Amino acid sequence: VVGAGGWWDRPRGVAVTGGWRTVCALRADGYNIVSVPRRGYHLKPPENAVWPSCIRAHLKAKWIAQRIDYYDATGSTNRIARALGSEDASAAPHGTLVIADEQESGRGRMTRSWISKKGDAVLMSLLLRPQNTAPDEAAVLVQVTALAVCEACRSLGAPALIKWPNDIVADGLKLCGILLE
């Protein structure tokens, strides 16, 4: 069990030797686990890691990413979010975040498709369940989202601009696209 800050907590009832075997198995799978005398084991996320616990730890929002579905690889985070959206709201609440390291059949506007290899992009879809919003009002969400993403990129030093209608670019390179369905 990985606790706060990446420190490993041995579950109750698991012997120290059982915990050591688990650490060895995780290291063999490529996880960077550091032994710290008298403290325990610390799981160090790889650079540019997209781990739900890392995302949740750095978010200040109250409702975004209370549930995070993470995939090493998927066809489309959007397709998964749409399927979750058809479920009961208690199973997939407003703000559910779907993220992946790799995507084989991403979709954009006008049914454009694209592939993203591991490490090429941040791939995510956010499930929103707006209350009392007419379909024609929902289109405003694209512009509001574009403004928010653009401002976030600028706060990190990127000279981000909105390329109408749904892309964020910086220095001529696309940073992200926003798809609302």
Where are the regions a protein language model picked out?
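Short beta-strand elements
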Residues: 180-181
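Catalytic palm active-site di-aspartate
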Residues: 159-172, 177
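N-terminal lobe of the biotin/lipoate ligase/transferase fold
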Residues: 5-8, 12-13, 17-151, 155, ...
